[in-house]
C-alpha cells in the first residue's frame, strides 16, 4: 500500500477546446483548492487494486483505510494480510489504537502483518508504480475537488481491475546480488 497527496486546483479561465491545428489551450492561472490524499492498495500478482481518497493523511486516516481493507469481502477468509508500507510514522499498529476501541484495534492488528522496505528501498513497494500510473494516466490534470479525484480514480481502478493488469516483478535474487552488491557487507580475506 502507498499514498500520495493530490493538489486540488480549479481553473480561473475556462480552457479553450481543441480545434484543427490547435491543441487544448489552458490558461496558466489557477486557484488552489487545498489537497486530498489518494490511497492505493495493490495485490500485484492478482491484478487487483483499490483506490480511495481522504481529506488528510494521518495515522487515524491510515487506520480507517486498513479497516476497510480488512473488512473487504475479498479478504474475508484470509487469516493474515501482508501489507508492504513505507516507513512513515503513521504506518504503525499504534495508529489502529488511536483510531478505534481496543477490541477493534486488536482484531485488525491480528489480521495484518506490516512489512517495511529497507531505507531507500521504497521502489520495492508495488503500490508505488501503480500510483505513478494513476497519476500519469488519470490525475495529472487540474482537478478541483476530492469528489472528482475519487470519481476519476474509481474509473481508472475499475478499468485496470477488469483487465487484470498485474505487476510482472522480475527482480530475482541473482539480479539483486548484482544490482545491489553495494548494500552487501564486504568480507575481508
Name each region found by the language model.
Residues 9-11, 92-97:
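A short acidic (Asp/Glu
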Residues 25-31, 104-126, 142-144:
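RNase H-like polynucleotidyl transferase catalytic core
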Residues 49, 119, 127-146, 159-163:
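Active-site proximal helix-loop segment of RNase H-like, two-metal nucleases, encompassing DDE(D)
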Residues 12, 148-189:
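C-terminal domain-tail junction helix/linker
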Residues 2, 41, 47, 66, ...:
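Mobile genetic element proteins and their domesticated derivatives, centered on retroelements
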Residues 1-67, 180:
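Extended, low-complexity cationic-aromatic segments
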Residues 60-82:
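Short, basic/hydrophobic alpha-helical segments
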Residues 78-91, 117-120:
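Acidic/histidine-rich, metal-coordinating catalytic segments
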Amino acid at each position: 500500500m502507498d499514498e500520495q497527496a493530490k493538489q486540488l486546483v480549479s481553473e480561473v479561465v475556462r480552457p479553450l477546446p481543441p480545434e484543427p491545428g490547435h491543441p487544448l489551450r489552458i490558461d496558466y492561472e489557477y486557484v488552489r483548492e487545498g489537497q486530498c490524499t489518494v490511497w492505493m492498495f495493490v495485490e500485484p500478482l492478482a491484478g487487483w487494486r483499490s483506490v480511495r481518497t481522504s481529506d488528510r493523511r494521518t495515522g487515524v486516516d491510515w487506520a480507517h483505510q486498513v479497516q476497510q481493507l480488512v473488512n473487504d469481502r475479498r479478504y474475508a477468509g484470509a487469516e493474515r494480510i501482508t501489507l508492504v508500507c513505507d516507513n512513515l510514522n503513521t504506518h504503525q499498529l499504534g495508529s489502529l489504537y488511536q483510531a478505534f476501541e481496543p477490541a477493534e484495534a486488536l482484531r485488525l492488528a491480528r489480521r495484518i502483518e506490516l512489512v517495511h522496505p529497507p531505507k531507500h528501498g521504497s521502489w520495492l513497494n508495488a503500490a508505488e508504480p501503480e500510483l505513478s500510473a494513476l497519476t500519469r494516466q488519470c490525475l495529472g490534470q487540474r482537478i478541483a475537488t476530492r469528489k472528482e479525484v475519487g470519481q476519476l480514480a474509481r474509473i481508472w481502478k475499475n478499468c485496470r481491475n477488469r483487465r487484470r493488469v498485474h505487476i510482472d516483478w522480475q527482480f530475482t535474487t541473482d539480479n539483486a546480488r548484482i544490482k545491489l552488491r553495494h548494500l552487501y557487507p564486504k568480507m575481508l580475506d
